Structures are given as C-alpha cells and as structure tokens.
Amino acid sequence: MQDNNINIRSAHLEGAEVAWFAPLCNGDDQYLGRHDIRYKSDWSNTSNVLLTADRLGFRNILCPSSYQVGQDTLTFASAVAPLTSNINILTAIRCGEVYPPMLGRAIATLDHLLKGRLTINIISSNLPGTNLSSEARY
C-alpha cells in the first residue's frame, strides 16, 4: 500500500498550535446563524471559557473585537488576567476605535498584568459608516 502522507518539517516549527476562542461578542455560537443563550457574552460564561482553556493547557485564546453587542476586549482581558497562570491572551483591536497613546498605555499595563503573555491582533477594518478601499485601510 502506498503512503500518501506528506511530511512537512521546519527547524522553526515545534508543532501545530491549537488556540481557543472566548465568546466576547454577542451572537457567537457553536453554529453559524444560530443564537444559543449558553454562549452569551457575559462575565460568567466568557471567563469560564477562558479559565477552562487555561486549566486544560491551551497556550493561546482569542478575545475578539466586534461591532456587535458584547464585552470590551481590553477591559475583559484586564479583569481576567490575574486569574490566569499559563495561557496567552490574544486581544483583537480595531484601528480607529481607541486613541493610539491611550491604547499604548492600556496594552503596556495589560502586558504587565499578564507577565508577558499578551498577544495583540491589530485589525485594519472599516469603522461603522465608512467603506475605505483595502489600500487606504492598510
């Protein structure tokens, strides 16, 4: 029998990383287009998801940003940071929502709270009511 597997090796790749997702934005669900109250965006549910991922050994969790009703990413991450011990918190931040000097200070403070376990995802998306070209956004 022929082996059809393709082995990929890299000196810089230790293995695949599987991260998790914190349901900060209302409407996030295990299925697209369905709203399930078990996955609502509140402190109890969302912090439980994050702390469970931390306890189970996940190395990273995404705290998304959205224009939907939900929790603020940086505020939530700051509140849950002292409760974690191992997991990196990947905070998504949309350009234009926060004044850059204030964002810098907030990120620096959060990085101290997490003792270097902060990851940032800067999203260059449109703001509500605008429709810039990709070239202008990037």
What are the residue ranges of the model-derived segments?
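Flexible, glycine-rich active-site loops centered on histidine and acidic residues
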Residues: 7-39, 100-138
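Active-site loop-helix segments enriched in His/Asp/Glu that coordinate
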Residues: 71, 88, 107-108
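Positions that flank functional sites
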Residues: 68, 95, 125-126
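Conserved catalytic cysteine-centered active-site region
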Residues: 84-90
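Hydrophobic residues within beta-strands of alpha/beta enzymes
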Residues: 61, 89, 118-120
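N-terminal beta1-alpha1-beta2 module of alpha/beta enzyme domains
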Residues: 2-84
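Aromatic/His-enriched, Gly/Pro-containing loop or helix-boundary segments
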Residues: 90-103
